[in-house]
């Protein structure tokens, strides 16, 4: 049955048929799990809060389950796919399942970790994706860094990763991904996805993470990240140590670390998990106390 907006979403039968046609076996190496449940796809798109003006980038479109639903809601979709067979088939899938929307799709066959602004004819305003699970955090952070135009994010990742990304200071799972994601804005968990909606079914559940990019007191540029990222990494490298000890290598000595911490109005006896991103930016000397 045709969707009211002009796209026929893919179900289990179509997913299997496409995979067989392309001789594609989902691989752990590429972190591939194909969503075959249209209701889950609709839920993801709804959670993304897209407008008809949004230009979406999707990383790892696979066979096109989510892609078909995204073009119904957005002005355009650029799908970044590393697998040449999958990338080549997407336009054909659109001709089959959404012929009236095919002109809204652009496919970029490339590793998402290497994708650049110059690969895009239209700069994206939203990232919506079922991210490859083995590189989900690096891909998420790369896309946020490379495309300042992205103002909203809705990604599906392993549930444990979703919990870590959305963790708040002071919690046991708060760490490097939590701080670096919050560098860009507000991070929250937007739901849990069961195993049964994927083929093949993964070992663990998945989670939805939402990020709304905000205007921060610090520049969200390469120069700022070059100062802040090493401080975050050092603070969590040995997370049971106090910041005075953990940052001694970064600042040259424990006393130098203590001096920097006190200058940033941070207790040197605290551990890294107690600081929010603004503390780390201040500690890196990007903004004043």
UniProtKB/Swiss-Prot annotation:
GO molecular function annotation: 16S rRNA (adenine(1518)-N(6)/adenine(1519)-N(6))-dimethyltransferase activity; RNA binding
Keyword DNA damage: no
Subcellular location: Cytoplasm
Leader sequence residues: none
Alphabetical keyword list: Cytoplasm, Methyltransferase, RNA-binding, rRNA processing, S-adenosyl-L-methionine, Transferase
Cellular component GO terms held in the UniProt record: cytosol
E.C. number: 2.1.1.182
CDD domains xrefs: AdoMet_MTases
Catalytic activity: adenosine(1518)/adenosine(1519) in 16S rRNA + 4 S-adenosyl-L-methionine = N(6)-dimethyladenosine(1518)/N(6)-dimethyladenosine(1519) in 16S rRNA + 4 S-adenosyl-L-homocysteine + 4 H(+)
InterPro entries (alphabetical): KsgA/Erm, rRNA_Ade_diMease-like_C, rRNA_Ade_Mease_Trfase_CS, rRNA_Ade_methylase_Trfase_N, rRNA_adenine_dimethylase, SAM-dependent_MTases_sf
Listed SUPFAM superfamilies: S-adenosyl-L-methionine-dependent methyltransferases
A Pfam family it matches: RrnaAD
Matching PROSITE patterns: RRNA_A_DIMETH (PS01131), SAM_RNA_A_N6_MT (PS51689)
Binding sites annotated in the UniProt record for S-adenosyl-L-methionine: 33, 35, 60, 81, 111, 130
Free-text function comment from the UniProt entry: Specifically dimethylates two adjacent adenosines (A1518 and A1519) in the loop of a conserved hairpin near the 3'-end of 16S rRNA in the 30S particle. May play a critical role in biogenesis of 30S subunits.
Family of the protein in this entry: Belongs to the class I-like SAM-binding methyltransferase superfamily. rRNA adenine N(6)-methyltransferase family. RsmA subfamily.
The protein, known as: Ribosomal RNA small subunit methyltransferase A
Organism: Corynebacterium efficiens (strain DSM 44549 / YS-314 / AJ 12310 / JCM 11189 / NBRC 100395)
């Amino acid at each position: 049955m045709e969707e009211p907006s002009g796209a026929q979403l893919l179900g289990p039968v179509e997913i299997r048929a496409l995979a067989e046609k392309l001789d594609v076996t989902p691989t752990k190496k590429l972190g591939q799990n194909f969503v075959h449940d249209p209701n889950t796809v609709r839920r993801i798109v709804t959670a993304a809060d897209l407008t008809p003006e949004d230009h979406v980038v999707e990383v790892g479109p696979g066979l096109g389950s989510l892609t078909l639903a995204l073009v119904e809601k957005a002005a355009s979709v650029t799908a970044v796919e590393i697998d040449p067979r999958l990338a080549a088939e997407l336009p054909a899938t659109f001709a089959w399942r959404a012929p009236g929307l095919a002109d809204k799709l652009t496919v970029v066959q490339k590793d998402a970790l290497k994708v650049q602004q110059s690969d895009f004819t239209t700069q994206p305003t939203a990232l919506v994706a079922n991210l490859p699970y083995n590189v989900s955090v690096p891909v998420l952070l790369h896309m946020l860094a490379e495309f300042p135009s992205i103002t909203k994010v809705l990604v599906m990742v392993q549930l444990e990763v979703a919990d870590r990304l959305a963790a708040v200071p002071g919690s046991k799972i708060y760490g490097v991904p939590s701080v670096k994601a919050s560098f860009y804005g507000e991070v929250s968990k937007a739901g849990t996805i069961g195993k049964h909606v994927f083929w093949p079914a993964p070992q663990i559940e998945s989670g939805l993470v939402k990020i709304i990019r905000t205007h921060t007191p610090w520049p969200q540029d390469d120069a700022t990240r070059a100062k802040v990222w090493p401080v975050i990494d050092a603070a969590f490298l040995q997370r049971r140590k106090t910041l005075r000890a953990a940052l001694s290598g970064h600042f040259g000595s424990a006393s130098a670390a203590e001096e920097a911490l006190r200058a940033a109005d941070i207790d040197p006896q605290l551990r890294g998990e107690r600081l929010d991103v603004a503390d780390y930016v201040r500690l890196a000397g990007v903004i004043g106390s």
